[in-house]
Design a protein with these regions (language model features):
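Structural alpha/beta surface segment adjacent to cysteine/selenocysteine redox centers
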Residues: 20-123, 201
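C-terminal cap of thioredoxin/glutaredoxin-like
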Residues: 3-34, 39, 118-208
Length: 208
């Protein structure tokens, strides 16, 4: 059961806004002595199931809105102290399934945060294609993870099933994208810009 001292953070390393939220939620949790329960999932699986129009919207975006979205991302990155490449990514969107399975494997050892951070930085700062084994190896090198062991572990059926189960669970709970955060069990928040509301919800649950 989720308590007032736990945050569930459903995330996919393919999203730049999730990168910001991953970075920004950690000091909030630390300040409130709240535990983050990391919940890796595949945002593409969510889109395919309940939000397929996202693909069409990317193909037929409003130019002014797209330009402002890029500016907003740069502004938030600067405010957060996160470095994101100013150049278009070589591969976008990226298939992040290997690193998300890796997150599941490493979460059991308490090593998920360092690995996920390295994956976010590799993709959004250094333009590394994290869908490929070579990209995963670069992430592992930064995070201090045995790449051969991890690549073998993520091929396990149980790991694949767990990632699919997390994705299905998020859909069942009303989620539609990344990052999705739950406080107190079923109080859902979406996006980096809602982290102040996450903080307020944690305080409210504690009677503040």
């Amino acid at each position: 059961m989720t308590s007032a001292h736990e945050i569930e953070f459903f995330f996919d390393c393919s999203s730049p806004w999730t990168y910001l939220a991953f970075h920004n939620i950690q000091p909030i949790a630390a300040a409130l002595d709240a535990r983050i329960r990391w919940r890796p999932f595949m945002v593409g699986g969510v889109f395919n199931t309940i939000n397929p129009t996202v693909y069409a919207s990317r193909q037929h975006s409003v130019p002014a809105k797209s330009a402002y979205a890029k500016k907003s991302l740069r502004d938030w990155a600067r405010w957060s102290g996160v470095e994101i490449t100013p150049h278009p990514l070589t591969v976008f969107p990226v298939n992040s399934v290997k690193v998300m399975r890796g997150c599941l494997v490493l979460d059991r050892e308490g090593r998920l945060p360092a690995f996920a951070r390295a994956a976010f930085e590799a993709y959004f700062r250094d333009d590394v294609d994290i869908s490929q084994d070579d990209g995963v190896r670069k992430v592992c090198a930064v995070a201090g993870v045995d790449a051969d062991a991890l690549l073998a572990a993520i091929a396990d059926r149980a790991v694949k099933d767990e990632l699919r189960a997390n994705t299905d669970e998020l859909i069942a709970r009303g989620g539609y994208g990344s990052p999705t955060i739950f406080v107190g069990g079923d109080d859902m928040y979406f996006g980096n810009d809602h982290l102040p509301l996450v903080q307020a919800a944690l305080l409210r649950l504690r009677g503040h």
